[in-house]
């Protein structure tokens, strides 16, 4: 099921998310809905707060054709190591459509999480995968990619998003 994605500014996007105690049937269904929503958008990552759920859950799939899809469901993800080398990617966000900016992050990160069967997982991500997982974990901590930008750029994007939300509310766009 495709779920509506919250748009910035929305106070729910700025909250610290609660840990998941167990991968219940409802939460696994939520994760699968999030994957459907992410692919439909289209995007490469989505965090539970972006669909209005204050839980530490993200989904992602950064594959590029012709490699096969690799959907990941991560409950309670945490970065346990990051490289000292950094890289810069132009990031966007499904909650801030049509806005992009360069963000510098560690080039590689090791992340621990529980999967949908509640098995412990750990993997080192590099490149776009590393950027994506860090971006999505930021959502769980109430942080958006625009929070890495200067105040003026962040305010400009926020004003544009407020205007876009008003237009959507009036039935436009």
Language model features by range: what are they?
Residues 1-173:
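Positively charged
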